[in-house]
Design a protein with these regions (language model features):
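Conserved glycine-rich Rossmann-like NAD(P)H-binding loop of the short-chain dehydrogenase/reductase
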Residues: 35-49
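Rossmann-fold cofactor-recognition segment
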Residues: 55-71
Length: 208
């Protein structure tokens, strides 16, 4: 039931691909509660997915950005602050990808080039994003930055493969950068793990 919990709050939501995405569902709820946001995803994902439908439904704009590119992230933040005429209140990082999982590589036989690419997209991108936000002083005080993690960052889930390592690094970045964001900017940084969902990076796992 809408009660405008996020009225006048502005932000960025990463990772909405289609209506099965957690980021998509989050965007719908944020809109329902009165929040406004810019939607973003990698350019190829924007072309493949149906994010424009979500933008229309939530009265949002779409700014494509490669989360592994500082230039793209800088442009995204600049465009967002220009759109809202000021700083923002929240960011959702809902990004994850493992080529090793998609290619069926066992954890004991990983392709390390794929491992590095997946780590860069799934975890290092969170540091890049916060670094850009921090350097541009883009967050309002008492704002919130949230990234999606998974319990495999702390426990053994063999089929989650190298994504478990990516999520562990993601959580470490949240703690480390969260210290500086909290101390200097009074901004909260957290990760959250869904209880049950179908992960698009893990086609062999349903409702993990």
């Amino acid at each position: 039931m809408p009660n405008e919990l996020l009225k006048n709050k502005k932000g960025i939501i990463f990772g909405a691909l289609d209506e099965n995405s957690i980021a998509w569902k989050t965007a719908e709820k944020v809109h329902e509660q009165g929040g406004s946001f810019v939607l973003t995803n990698a350019p190829v994902a924007v072309r493949m997915g149906s994010i424009d439908l979500l933008a229309k439904k939530t009265n949002s704009i779409v700014v494509p950005a490669d989360a592994t590119s500082n230039l793209d992230l800088d442009n995204l933040i600049d465009e967002t602050m220009k759109h809202f005429n000021g700083k923002i209140d929240f960011v959702l990082h809902s990004i994850g990808m493992s080529i090793n999982v998609r290619k069926g590589k066992h954890y004991t036989d990983l392709n390390h080039d794929w491992l590095t690419k997946g780590w860069n997209i799934s975890a290092a991108s969170f540091h890049r994003l916060m670094q850009c936000l921090y350097n541009k002083d883009a967050m309002n005080e008492r704002g919130s930055i949230v990234a999606l993690s998974y319990m495999a960052a702390q426990r053994v889930f063999p089929d989650y493969n190298d994504m478990a390592d990516n999520k562990a690094y993601l959580e470490s970045v949240a703690r480390s950068f969260g210290y500086f964001f909290g101390k200097e900017k009074k901004v909260r940084v957290n990760t959250i793990s869904p209880v049950s969902y179908t992960h698009l990076t893990l086609p062999t796992i349903c409702s993990v």
